[in-house]
Curated annotation (Swiss-Prot):
This is Integrator complex assembly factor WDR73. GO terms for cellular component: cleavage furrow; cytoplasm; cytosol; spindle pole. Component of a multiprotein complex required for the assembly of the RNA endonuclease module of the integrator complex. Associates with INTS9 and INTS11 in the cytoplasm, stabilizing the INTS9-INTS11 heterodimer and blocking the active site of INTS11. BRAT1 then joins the complex and plugs the active site of INTS11, leading to WDR73 release and nuclear import of INTS9 and INTS11. The keyword Cytoplasm applies. Interacts with INTS9 and INTS11; the interaction is direct. Part of the multiprotein complex composed of BRAT1, WDR73, as well as integrator complex subunits INTS9 and INTS11. Keywords: Cytoplasm, Cytoskeleton, Repeat, WD repeat. Its main location: cytoplasm. GO terms for biological process: cytoplasmic microtubule organization; nucleus organization.
Length: 371
């Protein structure tokens, strides 16, 4: 309890802003729509799960230090129910459409956010090629005049389906059965993938399958399960791919040479991730060479990778969000597990994070080293 009390006092110095919200169920989904709205969705099995469109607190636009605000001041704009668990959700830009994936993974679901009422309704399903009991398809969205849904649980089952016609516009055509941990569309013709084993690849959909990829994690990068994210163009110089292992190994790679990491570091995690499905690494859209990781415990860790060199180093976080541990009086051993996090698209140091106890936090952290 003393640790929790100490953190509450320290939080006035650590955060420019902090809001807490209790969802009706835990979420693995935090998907932005604009700068003020976010989608969340439940992932419990054998029950209906809510899909909600939340509007963030208006006071986030206030600049002065406001301290803690553990109150229910998020607003529900739209809502709906899914008959299955929702592990991933993507908004189709410039439309009112959503796509969700989860278990059972025999299809992905299309949804429409109604304009004339507050309902999110299911409108269609898209069959997937890999129909295995324990696998669910990863999804990403090609943004163009004719948007497409990229999906697949394995490399062999990767397909793109046109949103309007639901015709298949791309198929990987490979027999490679590597299971996927994440997919990320990069532009109108290319996407990146990360396999559970750590394989990374860049694919041009205009060409026959010939992915520029790593065969396995590079030298010095060991781990049982992996996830990755590619930094958007224009986010500063340096390595553009971050790959995170379930043992806390973090590798930075250049897209022109995926076989050899530019640098790697060991993050200070006390034990491997208890649920590698929840591993997440994200680049900060408004800060150069800054990223966040979660999925190991009740924290979100933020790193400045500017000083990392080619040697394996012991990384120290620039900031650690411990609100999911201490805000409700938990101790470290009984703390909930952070299920996901995301950066605000416009506010450089503002993040959202969710945890297995159904808590949802939005927080603007202070860079104490800079101050």
């Amino acid at each position: 309890m003393e640790l929790a009390e100490d953190w509450l006092v320290e939080s006035l110095r650590l955060y420019q802003d902090f809001h807490a919200f209790d969802l009706s169920g835990a979420t693995r989904v935090l998907e932005w729509i604009g700068e003020k709205g976010v989608f969340v969705a439940g992932y419990e099995s054998l029950k209906k799960n809510e899909i909600l469109h939340l509007i963030l607190p208006l006071r986030l636009s206030v600049q002065e230090n406001q301290g803690l605000h553990p109150e229910r001041d998020f607003k529900v704009r739209h809502g709906g129910f899914s008959d299955r668990s929702v592990f991933d959700l993507k908004h189709v830009p410039d439309t009112r459409l959503l796509v969700t994936s989860g278990l059972p993974g025999c299809y992905i679901q299309m949804w429409q956010v109604r304009e004339d009422n507050d309902v999110i309704e299911a409108v269609s399903t898209i069959d997937v090629q890999d129909k295995e009991e324990s696998l669910w398809p990863r999804v990403s969205v090609f943004c163009s005049k004719a948007p497409g849904i990229l999906h697949g649980a394995r490399l062999s089952g990767l397909r793109t389906v046109d949103v309007e016609s639901q015709k298949i516009t791309y198929s990987s055509g490979t027999a490679d059965s590597e299971s996927l941990s994440c997919l990320q569309v990069l532009d109108a013709n290319t996407f990146a993938f990360c396999g559970n084993s750590g394989r990374l690849g860049l694919v041009d959909t205009r060409q026959k399958w010939a992915a520029l990829e790593t065969v396995s994690p590079g030298s010095g990068c060991s781990g049982e399960r992996w996830c990755a994210e590619v930094r958007n163009k224009g986010q500063g110089p340096g390595p553009c791919i971050a790959s995170l292992g379930s043992d806390g190994q973090l590798c930075l790679l250049d897209s022109r040479n995926l076989c050899h990491p530019v640098s790697s570091a060991q993050c200070p995690v006390f034990k491997p991730s208890p649920d590698p499905e929840l591993l997440r690494v994200t680049w900060a859209p408004g800060l150069d060479n800054c990223l966040a990781i979660s999925g190991f415990d009740g924290t979100v860790q933020i790193y400045d990778v500017t000083s990392w060199d080619g040697k394996k180093t012991q990384a120290e976080p620039l900031f650690t969000h411990k609100g999911h541990i201490f805000l409700d009086g938990n101790d470290v051993d009984s703390a909930p597990l952070v299920t996901t996090h995301t950066w605000h698209p416009r506010k450089p140091r503002t993040l959202l994070s969710a945890a297995s106890d159904s808590s949802l936090h939005v927080w603007d952290w202070v860079d104490l080293q800079a101050s």
